[in-house]
């Protein structure tokens, strides 16, 4: 019997017991501390509640000692790995952060006042001062206002921004707010996945890595992160930047095993799943070509009229149906018929406003700030909300200064989802079902209960 068959059988028999303890499967987590040293294996797996996420490096194992991604380069003890944890698919999960708060007594560098708290002038020893990070996985992002271009000259914005609600106090703070010596707007966002980056750089729009698309290259992103988030006093050296970018672009993250579905990248399985398939595929194509999409999960489909196939095969059949929902179930977006895959495909890194941050479409979040955007009469209006918009994150507009960009967010990748809840840039979807329900409500799709379950199962194995 093949090794994968033994593994899958054992997984199905033992999943309940394994979830009940911090064993090979279940809710156990591994926190990677800056400067801890050791190797990150070429193929490393970490437990999560749905199975395991796997981090694969196509160039082999990496010695993390003295590596600039893993060593602190600033003054607050952080490294790149602090906010891009392998166990969380090279991002962070809110549940992991709550565990880390307890384990470290709130002293881990990830809770640094600069952006790991709701505002730096709050009492830093209180968990309430870090509530957005602990509950929603959100870091504070301070953006200059008015925005500055690449030459650091101010851009004349097409709109006026007013603070309507400020629960963190940072946007009205004398030191950190709009009336400070260096006027800034504080928004709160999830960290992006620092893996699978060839899927982002090879697309038609090129690299758009950050939530608002403000960094043109991975080198500039790393430089900004080290100067701001690590609070370094000097810029990273060219060699440090080279090593960071080299590491990030050879790394792949995806769910590797599921407690019900078994090994996800076993030989002969769907070519869309697992980091190994990603690393072997052509950059920007989700490891497969577009004409292969409809047949991706044929091997997991349930034959018509077949009896119950058992837990694993029934789950896999559900994933196959979920892929149909993702790739083929159409709905209306503005004037066109689209599918999930229309926007969430490899290489698609455009920014758009799907309503996650604008008050007219999103559920209200009293713990986040609220801004009123009033656009100039001469400006091109927002394509949906016109010239007066209420939002807790103006998105791309904070960089471009354009009214039409208010609320527009660069689409995030959807790999390793099971390892890094919550979802959306503002952490507003606590679960995958919350994410699906948002789209169903926002675009009046009309998913059936079965379609929702199948789509959820599909997303959890990516």
What residue ranges belong to the model's regions?
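Bacterial N-terminal signal peptides that target proteins for export
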Residues: 1-9
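Periplasmic c-type cytochrome electron-transfer domains
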Residues: 20-462
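Hydrophobic h-region of N-terminal signal peptides that target proteins for export
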Residues: 11-20
